[in-house]
């Protein structure tokens, strides 16, 4: 349910920036979401469509780029992306630890305007 609040923040930022730059219409917004944020892109899209009504971003295309988290095995050193909700190394079965905080992103990558 936190998608509503993060989407509200995203829309507020988007509209504020558009007003500063005297943009008449936002046509496309690309958002980066890390897989570990727990943010569901479908929910963001749902709230985005509602929250942008009667704004410069109404009807804008919303595109998502999902960033996969990478883990490193504590036993064999293998670097891998998790699958099937497990943090076990696919090579040796050891425990993986998160590398470089990848997968925790949530930000606007780009905005296209008319």
Swiss-Prot record:
Q: Which organism is it from?
A: Caldanaerobacter subterraneus subsp. tengcongensis (strain DSM 15242 / JCM 11007 / NBRC 100824 / MB4)
Q: Pfam families given for it?
A: HypA
Binding sites annotated in the UniProt record for Ni(2+): 2
Signal sequence, renumbered to the chain: none
Organismal lineage: Bacteria, Bacillati, Bacillota, Clostridia, Thermoanaerobacterales
What does the UniProt record say this protein does? Involved in the maturation of [NiFe] hydrogenases. Required for nickel insertion into the metal center of the hydrogenase.
Q: Which InterPro entries match?
A: HypA/HybF (IPR000688)
A Gene Ontology annotation in the biological process aspect, one of them, is: protein maturation
Record's protein name: Hydrogenase maturation factor HypA
Stretches of the chain forming a coiled coil according to its record: none
The protein's UniProt keywords, in alphabetical order, are: Metal-binding, Nickel, Zinc
GO MF term (any one)? zinc ion binding
- Family statement: Belongs to the HypA/HybF family.
Residues that hold Zn(2+) according to the record:
73, 76, 89, 92
């Amino acid at each position: 349910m936190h998608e509503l609040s993060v989407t509200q923040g995203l829309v507020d930022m988007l509209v504020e920036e558009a007003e500063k730059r005297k943009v008449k219409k936002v046509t496309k917004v690309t958002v980066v979401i890390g897989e570990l944020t727990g943010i569901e892109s479908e929910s963001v899209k749902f709230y985005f469509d509602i929250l942008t009504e009667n704004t410069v971003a109404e009807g804008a295309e919303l595109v998502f780029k999902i960033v996969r988290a990478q883990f490193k095995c504590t036993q064999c050193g293998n670097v891998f992306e998790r699958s099937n909700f497990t943090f076990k190394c696919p090579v040796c079965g050891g425990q993986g630890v998160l590398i470089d905080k990848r997968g925790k992103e949530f930000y606007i990558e780009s905005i296209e305007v008319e």
